[in-house]
Amino acid sequence: MAAGCCGVKKQKLSSSPPSGSGGGGGASSSSHCSGESQCRAGELGLGGAGTRLNGLGGLTGGGSGSGCTLSPPQGCGGGGGGIALSPPPSCGVGTLLSTPAAATSSSPSSSSAASSSSPGSRKMVVSAEMCCFCFDVLYCHLYGYQQPRTPRFTNEPYPLFVTWKIGRDKRLRGCIGTFSAMNLHSGLREYTLTSALKDSRFPPMTRDELPRLFCSVSLLTNFEDVCDYLDWEVGVHGIRIEFINEKGSKRTATYLPEVAKEQGWDHIQTIDSLLRKGGYKAPITNEFRKTIKLTRYRSEKMTLSYAEYLAHRQHHHFQNGIGHPLPPYNHYS
């Protein structure tokens, strides 16, 4: 299911902050934004199955708080089914039932990679090739070329977010993802275009913006239901909350692992921000916070600039089946 930021029916997930804050994209899945206030990654309004998440903090299709809304993915071509979270045993921790096993992908040293998983536990799955593929897909779409063929990286199913930032200050330009586990080849292809062209907080991307873009791919892992709303670590876990608002409606919202740390928030500030993003209007009390159902998760993230993308294409031959040459970087400047 794809997710948005602030809980609405069939929302999109975006991992960025509301458009009013200069960024966007948060969903009930994950999504990373930089520490800019615009990029409060991961707010999401989870509706039902088949919803998209705007992981940067906002509903992609309306809802409260200029966030992102969750909407069913159009033409979703990935597999893997939805993520099944085991119910929290009494007061224990529920684990993600559909987490892929033993993925093997290394992250190139020339790219920026971040993972909230414990170091050395396993190889990173996210890779620079995934960001290159996203750039390939967007480039081909904007220039009318045939879409790139099947990439060479793993096609295992993961919940994922694709985030676009632009300019030297890395302003949020689009961020949408899904908490449903999708096969990476089709999932990245779909959410590359969805985040670039259909994030309701921004106009569709144009060719002129390509040279200034940064692409981030986030893969979400290790989902755990917890009993205590404080049982998560700032900078390590992303969180998804579910609560009943003052009108008796169920709402959800999410922030990616990097959001709270980038914003300088503690646990309470993060929870309260998520409640507001999820549309909760009443005064927030400690008693109400205790009624929240919280799921924590981790993520792996890779970021690549357009210039790095061209360098990888030229020097590492990440062609991904494209049958046309990319023009030199100066062509766009």
Curated annotation (Swiss-Prot):
Sequence segments annotated as region (Disordered): 1-39, 101-120
Pfam families: AMMECR1
UniProt keyword Oxidoreductase, yes or no: no
Keywords: Alport syndrome, Deafness, Disease variant, Elliptocytosis, Hereditary hemolytic anemia, Intellectual disability, Nucleus, Phosphoprotein
Protein localization: Nucleus
Stored PROSITE patterns: AMMECR1 (PS51112)
Top-level taxonomic group: Eukaryota
Effect of G177D: In MFHIEN; creates a novel nonuniform expression pattern in the nucleus
All residue ranges annotated as the AMMECR1 domain in the record: 119-313
Major place of residence: nucleus
Biased composition (Low complexity): 28-37, 101-119
Recorded disease: Midface hypoplasia, hearing impairment, elliptocytosis, and nephrocalcinosis: An X-linked recessive disorder with onset in early childhood, characterized by midface hypoplasia, hearing impairment, elliptocytosis, and nephrocalcinosis. Variable clinical features include anemia, and mild early motor or speech delay. AMME complex: An X-linked contiguous gene deletion syndrome characterized by glomerulonephritis, sensorineural hearing loss, intellectual disability, midface hypoplasia and elliptocytosis.
Protein name according to UniProt: Nuclear protein AMMECR1
Taxonomic source organism: Homo sapiens
